Curated annotation (Swiss-Prot):
<keyword id="KW-0472">Membrane</keyword>
<feature type="transmembrane region" description="Helical">
    <location>
        <begin position="4"/>
        <end position="24"/>
    </location>
</feature>
<dbReference type="InterPro" id="IPR005180">
    <property type="entry name" value="DUF302"/>
</dbReference>
<comment type="function">
    <text>Fluoride-specific ion channel. Important for reducing fluoride concentration in the cell, thus reducing its toxicity.</text>
</comment>
<feature type="transmembrane region" description="Helical">
    <location>
        <begin position="67"/>
        <end position="87"/>
    </location>
</feature>
<comment type="similarity">
    <text>Belongs to the fluoride channel Fluc/FEX (TC 1.A.43) family.</text>
</comment>
<dbReference type="GO" id="GO:0005886">
    <property type="term" value="C:plasma membrane"/>
</dbReference>
<feature type="transmembrane region" description="Helical">
    <location>
        <begin position="35"/>
        <end position="55"/>
    </location>
</feature>
<keyword id="KW-1003">Cell membrane</keyword>
<dbReference type="Pfam" id="PF03625">
    <property type="entry name" value="DUF302"/>
</dbReference>
<dbReference type="InterPro" id="IPR003691">
    <property type="entry name" value="FluC"/>
</dbReference>
<keyword id="KW-0406">Ion transport</keyword>
<feature type="binding site">
    <location>
        <position position="74"/>
    </location>
    <ligand>
        <name>Na(+)</name>
    </ligand>
</feature>
<protein>
    <recommendedName>
        <fullName>Fluoride-specific ion channel FluC 2</fullName>
    </recommendedName>
</protein>
<keyword id="KW-0915">Sodium</keyword>
<keyword id="KW-0813">Transport</keyword>
<dbReference type="InterPro" id="IPR035923">
    <property type="entry name" value="TT1751-like_sf"/>
</dbReference>
Length: 270
């Protein structure tokens, strides 16, 4: 809890400083119309829309959400000054009341338009950021490999047993070693198993159909040249980034990360 409070305070401080900087850049008006607060609120709405759209395309860590989403955005979009300014302005005189009414109307309309504009900007930015992922990240990341205490065949059996005990489906197994033998080639023991939960997988495909290319989850048990056995799986969190899944997939991805980790740990361990 303390770490969350610290992150919110840090983000809020940056947000408040940003808001004050914006207000200082706007010249005051002689008729009492709080243009500085209006501009700060419109900019805050634009930033909120942008951050919302960017978060919808990629799953970030809790700390990123806390410091930017809750902290900084909360600091920059402090609408209490908007409400206070409206009341003070309206209570001054009849003419000031009309100015306050116009101020409230313009603030709401401009804020709504700014949010929409920010979301459009965020979506375009997300398209640019995620359209061409670096080839190195595709090749070098996304795989989780752990050493197994068991043979390749037993490791695969343990994957199947644990997956079934957790309510998952085991769809198929592929014995690459046997396939190599049939082809007259040599290959150390290597077996693949495909398993998963259709409830989670369907949610992900409803978000982005292309993730069906990487579903269900695959686990590969293989023996290296020294006789050690390894178990390799795709990291579901990496798959979420690869396919630019949105926040609607967050719960399913977290469940998949937990489930895959549990299966892997059991299959490779004692």
């Amino acid at each position: 809890m303390l770490d969350i409070i610290i992150l919110v305070v840090i983000g809020g401080a940056f947000g408040a400083m940003t808001r004050e900087f914006i207000m200082l850049m706007v010249p005051p008006l002689t008729d009492g119309f709080p243009l500085d607060i209006l501009v700060a609120n419109v900019v805050a709405c634009f930033l909120l829309g942008t951050v919302t759209a960017l978060y919808a395309r990629k799953i970030h860590s809790r700390d990123v959400h806390t410091i930017i989403g809750t902290g900084m955005m909360g600091g920059v979009s402090t609408f209490s000054s908007f409400a206070y300014g409206s009341v003070v302005l309206a209570s001054a005189s009849v003419s000031a009341f009309l100015i306050a009414a116009a101020y409230v109307t313009v603030s709401v309309v401009a804020g709504y338009v700014a949010v929409l504009a920010g979301m459009k900007f965020g979506e375009k930015s997300a398209d640019i950021l995620h359209r061409y992922p670096p080839m190195a990240s595709i090749i070098d990341s996304g795989l989780v490999t752990v050493e197994s205490r068991h043979s390749v065949a037993e490791t695969i059996e343990r994957v199947a047993a644990k997956a079934k005990s957790m309510g998952m489906n085991v769809f198929t197994r592929v014995d690459h070693g046997a396939g190599a033998k049939e082809a007259g080639l040599g290959l150390p023991p290597t077996e693949l198993i495909i398993f998963g939960n259709p409830q989670n997988g369907t949610v992900l495909m409803q978000d982005k159909r292309t993730i069906g290319l990487d579903l269900p989850i695959r686990a590969l048990a293989w023996e290296d040249g020294s006789g050690k056995v390894w178990l390799t799986v795709n990291d579901p969190a990496w798959l979420a980034q690869r396919h630019s899944l949105g926040l609607s997939s967050d719960v399913a991805i977290k469940a998949m990360v937990t489930g895959t980790g549990t299966v892997t740990k059991y299959a490779a361990g004692d």
